[in-house]
């Protein structure tokens, strides 16, 4: 099946956003403002990088012919790529820390299961809703864990836990975005339907914002005490990322490539691995600016 340039373009955009947020995390001065418009814009766009990447992955998996042999080969390849990423970024990860590439490895291995959930419009919608509710009620990712807790892999039990529930990009709840992307491919909702989804999720985002004001806690933080957190990916984050990804999808789907952005998408895995190298070597550089 012929590659779609608009989907490659979305993947290229996800990689650019990921590079941007990793660079910002590496070089942003400790005294930089986190409440200025520029800082909020960078954080907001950066927070959409991984959800967009996984959503595109779900969309592309529908196009793929799945076999057990192919799944095992891809699983081994992606796990090795994750180890290579960790080796290129020892300042951020341990060598066997699960990450987004190991997430893709597990997702492709389990693709027949979650693609079945996405095949029917009703089961697609219910699956996304149930993931959000379960995550809201139980938050198995554990909000008390620190970054070091999430990357530490001292034994096989901890490694497996991080891969499935407690890591930086665990299978649950990130499978949400794979199912979402698969459904976008299978059901191809029209622009009116997509805007209805955006409207509903925006209403929820506003309610979450009101709740943060009432509770007198930050609306969004990477981790810690906030209404919306990335580590772990709580339900307000799932809703916010769903909204942002869908808006980006509306803007870029069926559009002509912008300045060869689609070509970046074809090199997404290579770019993801190698971008950690300059970040590692430059991680000790101290920068100072005002945002």
Model-derived regions: residue spans:
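Alpha-helical transmembrane segments and their immediate juxtamembrane cytosolic regions
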Residues: 1-291
């Amino acid at each position: 099946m012929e590659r779609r340039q608009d989907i490659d373009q979305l993947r290229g955009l996800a990689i650019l956003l990921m590079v941007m947020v990793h660079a910002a995390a590496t070089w942003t001065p400790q005294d930089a403002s986190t409440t200025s418009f520029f800082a909020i814009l960078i954080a907001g766009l950066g927070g959409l990088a991984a959800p967009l990447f996984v959503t595109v992955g779900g969309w592309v998996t529908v196009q793929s012919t799945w076999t057990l042999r192919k799944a095992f080969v891809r699983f081994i390849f992606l796990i090795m790529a994750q180890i290579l990423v960790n080796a290129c970024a020892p300042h951020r990860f341990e060598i066997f820390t699960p990450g987004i590439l190991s997430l893709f490895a597990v997702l492709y291995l389990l693709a027949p299961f979650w693609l079945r959930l996405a095949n029917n419009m009703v089961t697609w919608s219910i699956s996304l809703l149930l993931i959000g509710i379960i995550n809201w009620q139980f938050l198995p990712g554990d909000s008390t864990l620190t970054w070091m807790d999430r990357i530490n892999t001292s034994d096989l039990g901890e490694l497996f836990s991080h891969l499935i529930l407690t890591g930086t990009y665990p299978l649950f709840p990130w499978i949400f975005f794979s199912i979402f992307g698969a459904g976008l491919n299978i059901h191809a909702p029209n622009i009116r339907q997509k805007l209805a989804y955006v409207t509903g999720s925006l209403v929820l985002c506003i309610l979450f914002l009101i709740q943060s004001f009432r509770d007198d806690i930050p609306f969004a933080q990477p981790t810690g005490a906030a209404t919306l957190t990335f580590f772990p990916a709580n339900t307000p984050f799932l809703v916010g990322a769903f909204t942002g990804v869908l808006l980006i999808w509306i803007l870029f789907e069926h559009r002509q490539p912008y300045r060869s952005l689609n070509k970046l998408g074809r090199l997404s895995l290579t770019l993801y691995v190698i971008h950690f190298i300059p970040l590692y070597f430059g991680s000790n550089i101290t920068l100072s600016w005002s945002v």
